[in-house]
Structure formats: structure tokens, C-alpha cells
């Protein structure tokens, strides 16, 4: 059916070019909201009516006439009908829809994937300060970022996952001071406890390991504590390494890996920040005022010019960001996606302005951004605000411990990134169709159970399903399920292009719903072996697509529940 869809799309494009050679609209099919309206819908006649100054129903008939002359339409389509003001409803032949089952079974885990290309993308996400455990906002970033990486990989891209460590800011000094205070026997609330210190129990854990002169490994680096409470620089280095290690453990528990870790401090150590500022000054894109160095960001659409270097000689926080993205470009990544919290919205214009002003060939609009809003955690009907481990927020590890990795990943991807999300812990633990991840995973487990029953009760061999007589699949619920399977590749490519992994979650819920309706309507272990085999082939194809889609989200597909 994938081949049929491709050929029909070409036929539609040719027919539109015939009707409107000077301004043909983009050829596209839509999915009717009701099955009674056909399998695919075409709205092109209504789009063309105004520019061509013709009645949309007359145009629809002309388009149908043009389509019916195409060989692909004759091969794959049963009927074309005009509806309403100018819709065209397209009904596929049963044999067309049945092909999707064989296509899925033949492709397996590759169904929906495109051939490998030379395209390269770098996706930066999480990028937490190494000052504490990962919170639920970092969890949303991790789920979104990893799913976007997997989406691009399904489209044949080579993807690099990068974590940027902000290890050169004021907060690192606060971390060191907090740990030193613990080493001095102080605790939150005591006289002498730093006003801006981190209060979580993890600070006491860092202090204890520092006194014990332990060695921690973070990424590819090791650091051994000196055990000296007066060694503030040693405390700083150990605390950063300790928390980087802890964050790595959190990400491992979440099933997220990174290919590369980039340190903000390296931008200063290698002179990249100074070099970037030098390029901007040499290009005449800066000016001095009030003892500070300013960047002319208004030349690139920003609402006002921005300070780059303050009068005390320190850089504002967007300057290393500009240097970092110049580095990404120089590494050959011309497709870069940043996953960040919505509080970073104000930095986008100035970073892009700095990249344009640097005049190194970076195009406008580089990099792409996906900004996500906050996550609120509810448990027992009340908002959870504080974690003992973190001291002031709910951690990602808390959620994983409470509900499991699969629930956390699916839930955090189940809404558009730019909407606030309420994570209901109680809902995530429910074992019914109210819980979206359970609903989808249960569909897969249910299919596996039916196939096991077939093997045990009727000595069925799953290897024979690829040879099933698919002509037996004519029930309305079967047609609905096959059409939903056929929509998977198009959905994947659209989700990748739009940076919208929530589309995958929406699709999987719809697919699970189509399966559950089918399960309720039909029997699968019948007295007719050919019918049973055909239906089980459809179930096996459905299970495969469920597995493929869940894998994109980093969620498992259990055989039993």
C-alpha cells in the first residue's frame, strides 16, 4: 500500500498540473474524520476554486475525470466521489489496503524507516548545570531530545547527541561553597550557612565522599578528592565531577545516552570566546558604551542591542553560546537542534544575531530550537514540590522510581513541547485504558498473547503468516486498522520535519484504539484456518508497528502484562 500511496500522490500531482498548470497546489491526501467518507480525502478543488474563479464542485468533477485517466488510479482505487462543497472522497480497493500487512511483515523493524543518507544533525539537550540532580524539566528535555534524535535516524540522518556542561558560571562557585560549608559541619539553617547555598541532601553526600578521598568518574575523566576542607578549588572540581557522574546515572536509568559532552569551560581555555568576540569587533558589529562592549543585535532583528562584555570585564551569558554554536558549525553540523526550557526564549534572537554578525557563513535561523514548558507533578491529588534528595524540586529519578522509565518517557512526550504538562503519578500507575502508556503497551501484549494461544491450541507457526491469504481481510475494523498501519511512515516523516515527537505518541494511541476495537469485534482463533491466519497476520503487523513506534519514544513493548 505504500507503493500505492506514492503512485497515487504522483497521479494527483499530474492531474492538478493539468487543471492549473500555472499554479498547481501541493498534492496531498487527508484522512477523513469518518470511515463512511472513504479512505482518503482530497481538498484541492476548494483550494483552486478562488484563483481559477470556478465552482469548486465543478472543479472536483474535472479533477476526478483527470484522475480516472491515470493508470495508478485505475490500479489502486475503487471509487472517487464528490461530497459537500467540493471534497473528493477516495475509496481504495480491498487489495490495495491488504498490501500493507505484507509490507510491514517483510520490512519488520525497518518499516517506516528511510534509507541512510549523508545528512548530519547535532541535537543538544538536557545540558544541565552540574550543580544538582536532574529535575523533571530535564527529564522532559531528555525524552524530547532523544525522541527527536530517533525520529531523524528513521529518516536516514546521522545524528550526534550532545550534552553541554555549564561548568564556568557563578553557580559552580555556589556549589563549591555549599559543599565546603557541609565539610565545616554546617547545615541549612545554621548560622554561617551561605545564603544562596544548595540545601539538598546530595551536598552532604558530596562532602562525605570528599572527606573519604574517593575517586569519581564522569564521562571519560576521573577526579580524586584531596579530603582537605580548605581546598576550595579541589572541592569545586570534585563536586562537579560527582554531580556529572550522578546525572549520568540518572540518564542511564532513563535510557538516554550521549555521544559527546562539551564543557563550557573549554571555550575559555581554548580561547574560543575571545576569538569569537574578536571576529565580531573586526567585523564592525560592536560598539562601546558606558565602559561595556555591545553587539549590534538590532541589525539582525533583535528588539535592542545587547551587552557582550560588562564594564568589569566579564562576559554576558550569551557570548559563550555564540562561540559554542560557531564551534558546532565549524565541526560540520549544518543542522543543529537545541532542546531547551521556554525560559531561554529571550536568548534566541541574540544568539542568532551573534552568529550572523560573526560572518562565518552561518545562515539565518540557525540553530533550530524546541522550547518546552514546565512540568507539574501531582501525587495523591496534590502538587509535589520538594524532593528530599534535591531539597527544592522533584527529580527525574523520583519519577522513575515512582512510575518506571516507560511511563515517564511516554508521558513527557505525550503533549506538545510548548504546552505546560501535569504529570499525574497516580494515573501513570493505573492499569487501565485511562493510562496512555498502559493502553498502548497492552495492545502489544494482547497481540502476543493471541499468537501464543494460536501456537499452543492450533499448532500455528508465526513464520507462515507472511504467506497468509490477505484477501480474507474485508471487515470494516480490518480496513480501519490497515489504513492506520499505512499512515505510519508519513506520520514519522512529518513528525521529524516538524520536530514533533508527540505526533508519534498520538499515533500510537490511535493505532492501539483501532486494534482494541478490532479485538472486540472479531474472533481470531476460528474454525477457518485461512481466515485465522489472515487475521493473525494483521495482528502481527500491528504489533510490529507498535514496537517500531514505541522504540522511537524509547519505550518498551512487553510481550506480557
Swiss-Prot record:
Keyword annotations: Aminoacyl-tRNA synthetase, ATP-binding, Cytoplasm, Ligase, Nucleotide-binding, Protein biosynthesis
Which BP terms does GO give this entry?
arginyl-tRNA aminoacylation
Q: Which reaction does it catalyse?
A: tRNA(Arg) + L-arginine + ATP = L-arginyl-tRNA(Arg) + AMP + diphosphate
Pfam families tied to this protein:
Arg_tRNA_synt_N (PF03485), DALR_1 (PF05746), tRNA-synt_1d (PF00750)
Where is the protein localized? Answer: Cytoplasm
Reading the lineage from the top rank, the first entry is Bacteria
Q: Does the keyword Metal-binding apply?
A: no
Q: Where is this motif: 'HIGH' region?
A: 128-138
Q: What is its main location?
A: cytoplasm
Q: What InterPro entries does its record include? A: aa-tRNA-synth_I_CS, Arg-tRNA-ligase, Arg-tRNA-synth_N, Arg-tRNA-synth_N_sf, ArgRS_core, DALR_anticod-bd, Rossmann-like_a/b/a_fold, tRNAsynth_Ia_anticodon-bd
* E.C. numbers: 6.1.1.19
Q: Name one GO molecular function term.
A: ATP binding
GO CC annotations on file: cytoplasm
Family statement: Belongs to the class-I aminoacyl-tRNA synthetase family.
What is said about its interaction partners and assembly? Monomer.
Q: What is this protein called?
A: Arginine--tRNA ligase
Q: Which organism is it from?
A: Methylibium petroleiphilum (strain ATCC BAA-1232 / LMG 22953 / PM1)
Gene for this chain: argS
Amino acid at each position: 500500500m505504500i507503493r500505492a500511496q506514492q503512485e497515487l500522490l504522483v497521479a494527483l500531482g499530474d492531474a492538478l498540473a493539468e487543471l492549473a498548470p500555472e499554479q498547481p497546489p501541493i498534492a496531498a491526501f487527508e484522512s477523513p474524520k469518518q470511515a463512511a467518507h472513504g479512505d482518503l480525502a482530497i481538498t484541492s478543488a476548494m483550494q483552486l476554486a478562488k484563483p481559477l474563479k470556478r465552482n469548486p464542485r465543478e472543479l472536483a468533477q474535472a479533477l476526478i475525470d483527470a484522475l480516472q485517466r491515470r493508470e495508478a488510479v485505475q490500479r489502486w482505487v475503487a471509487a472517487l466521489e464528490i461530497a459537500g462543497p467540493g471534497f473528493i472522497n477516495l475509496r481504495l480497493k480491498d487489495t490495495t489496503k491488504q498490501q500493507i500487512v505484507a509490507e510491514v511483515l517483510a520490512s519488520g523493524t525497518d518499516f517506516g524507516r528511510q534509507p541512510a543518507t549523508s545528512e548530519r544533525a547535532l541535537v543538544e539537550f538536557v545540558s544541565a548545570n552540574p550543580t544538582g540532580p536532574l529535575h523533571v524539566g530535564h527529564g522532559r528535555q531528555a525524552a524530547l531530545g532523544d525522541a527527536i534524535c530517533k525520529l531523524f535516524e528513521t529518516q536516514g540522518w546521522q545524528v550526534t547527541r550532545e550534552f553541554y556542561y555549564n561548568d564556568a558560571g557563578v553557580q559552580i562557585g555556589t556549589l563549591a561553597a555549599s559543599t565546603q560549608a557541609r565539610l565545616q559541619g554546617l547545615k541549612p539553617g545554621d548560622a554561617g550557612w551561605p545564603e544562596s547555598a544548595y540545601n539538598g541532601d546530595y551536598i552532604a553526600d558530596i562532602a562525605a565522599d570528599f572527606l573519604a578521598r574517593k575517586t569519581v568518574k564522569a564521562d571519560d575523566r576521573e577526579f580524586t578528592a584531596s579530603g582537605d576542607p580548605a581546598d576550595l578549588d579541589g572541592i569545586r572540581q570534585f563536586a562537579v565531577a560527582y554531580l556529572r557522574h550522578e546525572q549520568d546515572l540518572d540518564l542511564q536509568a532513563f535510557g538516554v545516552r550521549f555521544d559527546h559532552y562539551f564543557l563550557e569551560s573549554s571555550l575559555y581555555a581554548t580561547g574560543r570566546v575571545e576569538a569569537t568576540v574578536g571576529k565580531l569587533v573586526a567585523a564592525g558589529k560592536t560598539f562601546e558604551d558606558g565602559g561595556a562592549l555591545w553587539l549590534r543585535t538590532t541589525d539582525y532583528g533583535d528588539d535592542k542591542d545587547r551587552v557582550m562584555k560588562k564594564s568589569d570585564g566579564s562576559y554576558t551569558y550569551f557570548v559563550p553560546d555564540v562561540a559554542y554554536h560557531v564551534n558546532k558549525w565549524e565541526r560540520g553540523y549544518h543542522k543543529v537542534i537545541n532542546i531547551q526550557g521556554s525560559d531561554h526564549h529571550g536568548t534566541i534572537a541574540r544568539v542568532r544575531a551573534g552568529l550572523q554578525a560573526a560572518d562565518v557563513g552561518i545562515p539565518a535561523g540557525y540553530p533550530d530550537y524546541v522550547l518546552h514548558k514546565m512540568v507539574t507533578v501531582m501525587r495523591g491529588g496534590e502538587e509535589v514540590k520538594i524532593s528530599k534528595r534535591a531539597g527544592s524540586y522533584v527529580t527525574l529519578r523520583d519519577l522513575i522510581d515512582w512510575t518506571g522509565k516507560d511511563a515517564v518517557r511516554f508521558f513527557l512526550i505525550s503533549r506538545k513541547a510548548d504546552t505546560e504538562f501535569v504529570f499525574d503519578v497516580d494515573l501513570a500507575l493505573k492499569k487501565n485504558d485511562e493510562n496512555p502508556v498502559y493502553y498502548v503497551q497492552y495492545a502489544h501484549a494482547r497481540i502476543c498473547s493471541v499468537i501464543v494461544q494460536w501456537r499452543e491450541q492450533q499448532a500455528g507457526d508465526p513464520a507462515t503468516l507472511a504467506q497468509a491469504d490477505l484477501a480474507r481481510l474485508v471487515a470494516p475494523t480490518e480496513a480501519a486498522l490497515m489504513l492506520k498501519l499505512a499512515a505510519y511512515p508519513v506520520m514519522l516523516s512529518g513528525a521529524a520535519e516538524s520536530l514533533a515527537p508527540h505526533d508519534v505518541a498520538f499515533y500510537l494511541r490511535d493505532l492501539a484504539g483501532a486494534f482494541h476495537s478490532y479485538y472486540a469485534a472479531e474472533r481470531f482463533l476460528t474454525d477457518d484456518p485461512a481466515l485465522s491466519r489472515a487475521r493473525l497476520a494483521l495482528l502481527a503487523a500491528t504489533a510490529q508497528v507498535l514496537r517500531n513506534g514505541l522504540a522511537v519514544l524509547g519505550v518498551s513493548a512487553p510481550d506480557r502484562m
